[in-house]
């Protein structure tokens, strides 16, 4: 077996990636989320595949085909809700994974980090298009509002929006192409994940101290395979509790009403995992400014390596920047709450304040804190 594992051209790649991979001996449970994201992706592809067997991407039958899946297909309700709530679990793991990367300075592995940002955009695009497919009220109006933002692009905006719609409004052509893209993107994401892992294995994993761990590494199997297996069990248990006991808690009641272009819902809002970005978008009165702020809210992650001023890699031994980090986390929670509120006083001003705070903490306060800590510790 050892000979096959180390000599076979295909198996030796798996061996170097998941079995004999030298891994720091001190990585904590925060390093579990990479494998959990892989599990989420597998769950989403499998459940999505079975849903696609029964779904029809036509405006007249899309809504009823989802109802048919839940009512008439064997365990269709389970597959549908596992897919919907699986997306929420996916984003919880994603946010924790990115948060870990920011806290422990993993952004210094620039290729891996940039690949991760591309993956984040790809997953967000996939989730957005997936939300349109049931063709409920929030599906239709969410698609209309978000795609319409592209009309803010000077000169080509309106043409671009109509090109994406495949007509003069969100209609059959839009739904069909969104289904096609929603189906193909997870496979593209899988390929990007392999590139992400390729870059990661070039440098090796970071660790909570941020120090070079070459002198103290252990094989990935059995230590971290068992650790990841435990994480996977906890994730699947959480997903099943969510799916079986609270299937609709993260959804919108409006999406149980079939799409009606003549009736606008009182509050158009995306799924919970986009609310922080939606709040930043809404906090700017200008349409183009809002779109730019929306894109920058994610793209700012790419500036992290440039904004790193500290001589230490992680925040483990940096209390001032730690404080800034947790204020940033609280700020993101406030933005998520605001994104789901109506556009009226006092939510408008809270959203604007939280949006300014978000960019200020990342661009100004955290780099300043790093410099102050260098001076306190006399690290020239």
UniProtKB/Swiss-Prot annotation:
InterPro entries annotated for this entry? Answer: Cyt_b/b6_C, Cyt_b/b6_C_sf, Cyt_b/b6_N, Cytb/b6-like_sf, Cytochrome_b, Cytochrome_b_C_euk/bac, Cytochrome_b_N_euk/bac, Di-haem_cyt_TM
Q: Which family does it belong to?
A: Belongs to the cytochrome b family.
Quaternary structure and interacting proteins, as annotated: The cytochrome bc1 complex contains 11 subunits: 3 respiratory subunits (MT-CYB, CYC1 and UQCRFS1), 2 core proteins (UQCRC1 and UQCRC2) and 6 low-molecular weight proteins (UQCRH/QCR6, UQCRB/QCR7, UQCRQ/QCR8, UQCR10/QCR9, UQCR11/QCR10 and a cleavage product of UQCRFS1). This cytochrome bc1 complex then forms a dimer.
UniProtKB keywords? Electron transport, Heme, Iron, Membrane, Metal-binding, Mitochondrion, Mitochondrion inner membrane, Respiratory chain, Transmembrane, Transmembrane helix, Transport, Ubiquinone
Amino acids binding a ubiquinone: 201
Transmembrane ranges, per UniProt, are: 33-53, 77-98, 113-133, 178-198, 226-246, 288-308, 320-340, 347-367
Cofactor mode of binding and number, as noted: Binds 2 heme b groups non-covalently.
MF terms in GO: metal ion binding; ubiquinol-cytochrome-c reductase activity
Q: How does it sit in the membrane?
A: Multi-pass membrane protein
Please name the PROSITE patterns in this protein's record.
CYTB_CTER, CYTB_NTER
Superkingdom, according to UniProt?
Answer: Eukaryota
Instruction: Please explain the role this protein plays, according to its UniProt record.
Output: Component of the ubiquinol-cytochrome c reductase complex (complex III or cytochrome b-c1 complex) that is part of the mitochondrial respiratory chain. The b-c1 complex mediates electron transfer from ubiquinol to cytochrome c. Contributes to the generation of a proton gradient across the mitochondrial membrane that is then used for ATP synthesis.
- Mention any additional remark: Heme 1 (or BL or b562) is low-potential and absorbs at about 562 nm, and heme 2 (or BH or b566) is high-potential and absorbs at about 566 nm.
Does Membrane count among this protein's keywords?
yes
State any GO CC term: respiratory chain complex III
Q: Locate the residues binding heme b b562.
A: 83, 182
The name this protein carries in UniProt is Cytochrome b
Identify the residues that bind heme b b566. Answer: 97, 196
Q: Where in the cell is it found?
A: Mitochondrion inner membrane
The parts of the chain that form a coiled coil are: none
GO biological process assignments: mitochondrial electron transport, ubiquinol to cytochrome c
Name what cofactor the protein needs: heme b
